[in-house]
Amino acid sequence: MYRAKVYVYPKEGILDPQGKAVHQILKNMGYKAVNGVRVGKFVTLELNNALTEAEAYQQMEEMCQKLLANPIIEDYRFEIEKVTEEQE
């Protein structure tokens, strides 16, 4: 089995109201060292062993482009790891 971790976040230059709100609250709480906050999504998926590693990467790329991220306003990256029975 493969486990995929997907990180989706607003593109640079795209307004991020959640990030701005979190940043302001952190400043109000006294965390003055925080220069900026971007709020995104984290998704995990489990893919079965019927796929090769190359197929898993290809399918993850397609899933990110078609559903998990909006490529107009969001960037994404993903990691895939092989999971053994002991790790499940």
Where are these regions (language model features)?
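Long, contiguous binding/interaction regions
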Residues: 1-40, 48-50, 54-83, 87-88
